[in-house]
């Protein structure tokens, strides 16, 4: 098993207008592990002013596990599953579902979701923590902005055998048409200062420099290791999600542009409900939706941990898993029905590879993919493919879609 780094303490953040979430925890994907996640809305839309410990699930591969994915040349990657057709005025858009997982380091979860996606030719997105390509013994090769060398809130990649397994998973996923994005590196959030909210444009650029360095120079950063080829092109990493959803837009933007990123999915929606992504300063922003869940009896940011905290304050109570799984699944299906019969905005299902609260989230997410990704006029897709579809449309037709009111906001 990989070493885990325990974060001690809890930062309580009060937010009346914008709302802030901070969560923290530890260990592998069988229990909460990792560091805080902070969600700070960009606007004055109602947010989820809850505070609780959070954990990001890290890599969990065995030191003896063999790399499952075969290194496939990029040219052999399967084609997009999204029909690239232009709408005429008044046509109905396809219903896109965008499933994503922050961290993307668990071999077990990669294999589960790859298997779930295959029968319906579906796609999902893994936002990789760059440090999972850096062995524990080489951790001093990373220096987070404002932090000491070798420091991280989510640990590192474990052994080189585990990194080889992860490379196999990434290759397999990319060859099957799934998308690899960035979840940056050290996961420094409020309480692990300086956190992302304090970083300058130069800091974010340094963080991305190191992410792409780990991505492209994984052999040089793990000298002597027998590692397979990573066949995922670095220039296919087009966007991602910031650690803890932190960061100031004006500081992030120059770093994104300097590294060729074209989208982000870290900012709370400017209104309650599910809306179409918007292009802001040449970056497609896929807003984190703040939705109403009947089963939870209120509104919540549509992310696994937020739903857990809304349910029982983020307490590990596996005996409640059947109830919570049902609530999560019903929330997803209700939102699908509202978007499908409403504005057809892409439905974002934001998760982590985890077994929190008795596997209360990955199980219903997997079941939702199996049940809904193959429905008529519905495509579980990558961010980049949805962007390609949107940019194919006539500007006036696309604007009509983007201007539609939100759905899923509740009363």
Task: Give residue ranges: language-model regions.
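Active-site cleft segment of glycoside hydrolase catalytic domains centered on the general acid/base Glu
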Residues: 191-210, 251
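N-terminal pre-catalytic segment of deacetylase/amide-hydrolase enzymes
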Residues: 4-9, 14-99, 108-114, 118-119, ...
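Active-site-adjacent pocket scaffolds in enzyme catalytic domains
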Residues: 143-161, 227-343, 394-402
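Well-ordered, non-membrane alpha-helical segments in soluble/globular domains
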Residues: 110-111, 159-167, 204-209, 324-334, ...
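Active-site beta->alpha N-cap acidic-glycine motif
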Residues: 69-179, 186-190, 214, 218-247, ...
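C-terminal domain-boundary segment and adjacent tail
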Residues: 80-82, 263-276, 329-411
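A generic secondary-structure signal for well-formed alpha-helical elements
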Residues: 211-219, 260-263, 376
């Amino acid at each position: 098993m990989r070493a885990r780094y325990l974060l001690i303490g809890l930062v309580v953040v009060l937010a009346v207008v914008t709302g802030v979430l901070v969560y923290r925890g530890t260990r592998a994907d069988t229990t909460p592990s990792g560091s805080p996640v902070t969600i700070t809305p960009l606007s004055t839309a109602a947010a989820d002013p809850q505070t609780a410990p959070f954990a990001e699930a890290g890599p969990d591969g065995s030191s003896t596990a063999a790399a499952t994915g075969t290194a496939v040349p990029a040219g052999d990657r399967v084609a997009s599953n999204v029909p690239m057709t232009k709408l005429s005025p008044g046509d109905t858009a396809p219903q896109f579902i965008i499933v994503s997982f922050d961290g993307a380091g668990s071999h077990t979860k990669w294999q589960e979701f790859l298997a779930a996606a295959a029968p319906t030719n579906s796609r999902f997105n893994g936002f990789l923590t760059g440090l999972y390509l850096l062995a524990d013994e080489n951790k001093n090769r990373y220096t987070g902005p404002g932090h000491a060398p070798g420091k991280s809130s989510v640990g590192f990649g474990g052994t080189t055998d585990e990194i080889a397994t992860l490379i196999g998973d990434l290759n397999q996923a990319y060859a099957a048409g799934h998308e690899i994005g960035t979840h940056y590196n050290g996961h420094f959030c409020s309480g692990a200062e300086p956190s992302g909210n304090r970083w300058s444009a130069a800091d974010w650029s340094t963080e991305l420099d190191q992410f792409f360095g780990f991505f492209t120079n994984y052999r040089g950063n793990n000298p002597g290791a027998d590692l397979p080829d990573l066949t995922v092109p670095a220039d296919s990493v087009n966007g991602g999600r910031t650690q803890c959803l932190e960061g100031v837009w004006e500081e992030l933007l120059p770093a994104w542009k300097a590294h060729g990123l074209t989208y982000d999915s870290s900012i709370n929606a400017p209104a309650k409900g599910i809306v179409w992504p918007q292009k802001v300063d040449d970056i497609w922003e896929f807003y984190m939706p703040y939705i109403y869940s009947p089963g939870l009896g209120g509104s919540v940011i549509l992310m696994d941990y937020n739903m857990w905290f809304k349910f029982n304050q983020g307490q590990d109570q596996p005996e409640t898993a059947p109830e919570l799984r049902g609530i999560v699944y019903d929330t997803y299906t209700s939102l699908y029905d509202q978007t499908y019969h409403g504005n057809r905005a892409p439905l974002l299902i934001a998760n982590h590879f985890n077994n929190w609260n008795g596997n209360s989230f990955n199980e219903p997410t997997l079941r939702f993919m199996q049940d809904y990704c193959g429905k008529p006029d519905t495509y579980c897709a990558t961010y980049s493919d949805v962007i390609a579809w949107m940019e194919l449309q006539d500007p006036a037709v696309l604007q009509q879609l983007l201007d539609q009111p939100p759905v899923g906001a509740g009363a």
